[in-house]
Curated annotation (Swiss-Prot):
This is Argininosuccinate lyase. One of its GO terms (biological process) is L-arginine biosynthetic process. Coiled coil: none annotated. One of its GO terms (molecular function) is argininosuccinate lyase activity. Disulfide bonds: none annotated. Pathway: Amino-acid biosynthesis; L-arginine biosynthesis; L-arginine from L-ornithine and carbamoyl phosphate: step 3/3. It comes from Anaeromyxobacter sp. (strain K). It is found in: Cytoplasm.
Amino acid sequence: MRANSKAKPVSRAALAGEADPRLVALSVSIQDDGALYAEDIRGSQAHVSMLAAQGIVPKAAARRIVAALDQVRAEFAAGKIRFDPALEDVHTHVERRLGELVGKDAGYLHAGRSRNDQVALDERLFIVGACDRCDAALERLQRAFLGQARAHERTILPGYTHLQRAQPVSLAHHLLAYVEMFGRDRERFAEVRRRAAISPLGSGALAGTTLPLDREAVAARLGLAGVTHNSLDAVSDRDSAAELLFACALAAVHLSRIGEELVLWTTKEFGFATLSDAFATGSSLMPQKKNPDVGELARGRAGRALGDLVALLAILKGLPLSYNRDLQEDKRPLLGGPEALVLTADAVAGAVETATFHAARMEEALGSGEALATDAAEYLVDRGVPFREAHEAVGKAAAFSAREGRPMARLTAAEWATFHRRFEKDVLRCFDARRSLRRRELPGAPGPRAVRAELRRWEKALGKARG
C-alpha cells in the first residue's frame, strides 16, 4: 500500500487542521489491531453484500468491493501492507487500500456502519476463532495425558496433599485428573464461544442507523447465531473478551500445575519421570544439566495470562455507556492471550506424551507404609469403631513408628493391638498398596475398575470429538 501520511483521517472531517503528532502517536493501534485484518475484511464483505441486497449500494459496486477485499486480505497475509501511523488502525488501512483498488466505490462500504460496531464485530469474530483454537489445543493435550494414563493403569505412586505423601493412587488416576481439568476448560471456551457468536453490526456508533439494514442476514453470512438487542450495550460490550481471557487464565493455571509436577518429578530427589531430550534444555555453563524448561515456562506463562485478564478488567472498570476510546487498549491482552495458551498447551502436550515415567521409583516411594495409614483407620471403622477413635489409635501407631524408626508396615500384629483392642492379625493386610486400590472402586476413585471406566469414558468422548 502506498504511504500517504498527509491523508486526513476519516474521523477528523469536522475538525480543523491536523492532529498533533503526540496525539497521533498515542492513538495509533495498528501495531496491535493489525492482527484483526482477516476478521475486519470478513465483516466488511458480509456488510457490503447485505447493503447490495437491500438496494443501498449498487450490486456491481458491491461485487467489486468484495473481490478487492479478497486481494487486500491476501496482501495482508503476504506482509505487503506497510503500516502507516497516520492511518491509525486496521480499519483505515483496509479502507484506504480498498480505495486504491476500486476508487470511489470504496466509499459505499461504510454506509450504515460505525467504527464502534465494526470493531465490536471484529473482536467477536476473533473470539469465536480463538475459542476454537484453544479448544483444539486442549483436546490435543487431553489426548497426550490419556495415552500415558492408558499405558500406566498398573503403575502406583503416592498421592500427595501439602506435598506430603498421603494415600496411594495409580498413575493413570493422577493423569486423568488433568484430563478432567482440561475438559472443564474446554467447556468454558464453548460457553464463551456461544455468547460471543452474535452480531453487533447495525448498532452504529451507539443508536443504530436510519438505513434499512438486514442485521440477521449479516449474522447468517458470518455464521453467527443472531444479533445483539441493545445498540448502546453492543458497541461497548467486552464481556466475551473478558470471559475469553478468564478461560485462558484458568487453563494456564491448570498448565502451571502440571508444569510444577514436571519440574518436581524430574528431579533426582523425586525421580518419577524423565523428559525427552527434545523437551529439555541444557546449561551455558554446566555441561551435565538437563533442565525442565517446558514446565518452568508453563508456570511462568500463567502469570502473563492472569495479567492479561486483570489488565482488561481494569480497562473496563467504570466506563460509562456507550463506547469510549479506552476500549482500544483491549487489543493487546485479547489478541495475545489465546495464542500464548495454544503455544503452551502444545508444548506441554509434547512433553507429556514423550516423557518416561519410572514405575519402580514411584512404587518405592510407597514403601514405608505411612501412605496406607488411612486404610488402618478404616479397618477399625469396618469393625464398628467410631472414625475419630480409629483416627486417634492409628495416629498413636504412627507416632510409635516414628519413635522406633520402623515403618508402620513393619509393626507386628501384637504391637498394633496395643493401640486398639479391635486390631487383629489381618491388620497387616492394610499395608498392601495394590489391595488398597482394589478396595477403592467408588465412581471417581482410583480403583482399577473405576479407572478403567474413566479411561473408556474419556476415550469415547475424545473419539467423538475427533469424529
